[in-house]
């Protein structure tokens, strides 16, 4: 009997040999990329079905503000619009090319302890019936949840996409506390990045309280998820680095965050969740020891343009760290020999185990449908999955 996708996924993270390497098409597309590909020949079939690859099914509810903030336009001119988003942040955005330009963050919902306690009481309580909505429950019960589950109700086309082909296959499942499951990223959503970085020095009590609240909620919300479904892997979300390194020094971050990571990881393991991952963009090298020690065993996406090199990271950490990602998305715009060399570069890690080869984040719109198909074909060829 051939092992299921779920079993191959677990074997991979446990550095056990797998006859058929576990691989998915990637994680995300920019909206403009999807539009471009549809013009160039993609019929919209979910990519894991189209390319006959594995999938990591998401079963997470929304870990952020409930009720969500109402979308409220505060000001607009010919080129920009200023509004309150679903997380309570006042944003100013270009009307055109929203996805390809950075918004301006005008104001954040929290500035001090009193505002945080009010925000937490009004927006961050469990509200199990709203977080784990009827739509979420029925999707999970049918084993079909896959698209971005978190926010609100699933759209019809996402439900269709989540059904997928290969009806007998058992996919691995992931509960990803996206945007609100961590001890830097979620605080940044409330305070803003500059205010947060300064608060580590000026408002340590506020930081301590916010981290404690997040750890409490991560455990409380995830306990509810486990009433409805099992999953193989839990992911934190941090996005706390750029190409120059982390946005807060590793020693300072450890002082505040370590015990909260350790507590959540300990609780997860006690529930039988064997694998705990974390998503952070940027150059996270100096944070890896802290995360490993706290109980996190794999990371994503290892952005090449930020100096992350999965070959070097593997040399340093060996079997202690599972790696997901690390293929430079930038080589796909040109494709050809540069793309093949980049895929070749990471293949030794596939042999060693504990590695899932995929792009180091969302596929940008400068990648043609043909180049993406070429990339997947070559990846499958190198993995003997052609």
Language-model segment annotations:
Residues 18, 43, 58, 62-64, ...:
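Compositionally biased, intrinsically disordered/low-complexity regions enriched for serine, proline
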Residues 2, 40, 74-76:
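Generic structural signal for well-ordered secondary structure
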Residues 73-125:
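A contiguous, low-structure linker/loop signature
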Residues 1-33, 82-84, 111-386:
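Active-site loop segments of alpha/beta catalytic cores
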Residues 26-28, 61-62, 84-86, 96:
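Acidic/polar N-terminal loop/beta-strand segments that form early-domain functional surfaces
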Residues 17, 52-56, 75-77, 86:
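Short, solvent-exposed loop/edge-beta patches enriched in aromatic
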Residues 30-71:
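Segments that shape or occlude catalytic/ligand-binding pockets
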């Amino acid at each position: 009997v051939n092992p299921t996708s779920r079993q191959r996924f677990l074997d991979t993270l446990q550095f056990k040999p797998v006859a058929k390497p576990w691989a998915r098409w990637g994680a995300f597309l920019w909206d403009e990329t999807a539009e471009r590909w549809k013009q160039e020949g993609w019929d919209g079939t979910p990519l894991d079905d189209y390319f006959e690859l594995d999938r990591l099914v998401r079963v997470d509810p929304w870990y952020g503000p409930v009720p969500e903030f109402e979308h409220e336009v505060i000001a607009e001119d010919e080129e920009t619009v200023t509004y309150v988003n679903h997380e309570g942040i006042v944003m100013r955005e270009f009307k055109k090319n929203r996805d390809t330009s950075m918004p301006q963050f005008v104001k954040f919902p929290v500035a001090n302890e009193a505002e945080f306690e009010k925000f937490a009481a009004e927006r961050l309580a469990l509200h199990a019936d709203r977080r784990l909505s009827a739509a979420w429950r029925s999707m999970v019960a049918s084993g079909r949840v896959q698209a971005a589950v978190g926010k609100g109700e699933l759209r019809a086309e996402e439900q269709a996409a989540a059904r997928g082909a290969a009806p007998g296959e058992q996919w691995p499942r992931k509960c990803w506390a996206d945007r609100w499951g961590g001890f830097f990223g979620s605080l940044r959503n409330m305070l803003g990045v500059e205010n947060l970085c300064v608060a580590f020095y000026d408002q340590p009590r506020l930081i301590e309280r916010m981290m404690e609240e997040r750890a409490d909620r991560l455990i409380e919300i995830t306990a509810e998820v486990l009433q409805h479904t099992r999953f193989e892997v839990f992911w934190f979300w941090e996005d706390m680095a750029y190409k120059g390194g982390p946005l807060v020094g590793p020693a300072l971050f450890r002082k505040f965050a370590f015990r909260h990571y350790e507590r959540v990881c300990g609780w997860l393991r006690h529930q039988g969740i064997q694998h705990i991952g974390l998503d952070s963009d940027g150059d996270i090298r100096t944070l890896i020891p802290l995360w490993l020690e706290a109980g996190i065993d794999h990371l994503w996406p290892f952005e090449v343009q930020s100096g992350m090199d999965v070959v070097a990271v593997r040399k340093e950490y060996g079997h202690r760290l599972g790696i997901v990602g690390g293929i430079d998305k930038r080589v796909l715009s040109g494709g050809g020999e540069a793309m093949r060399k980049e895929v070749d570069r990471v293949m030794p890690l596939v042999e060693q185990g504990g590695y899932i080869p995929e792009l180091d984040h969302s596929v940008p719109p400068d990648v043609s449908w043909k180049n993406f198909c070429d990339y997947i074909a070559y990846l499958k060829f190198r993995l003997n999955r052609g």
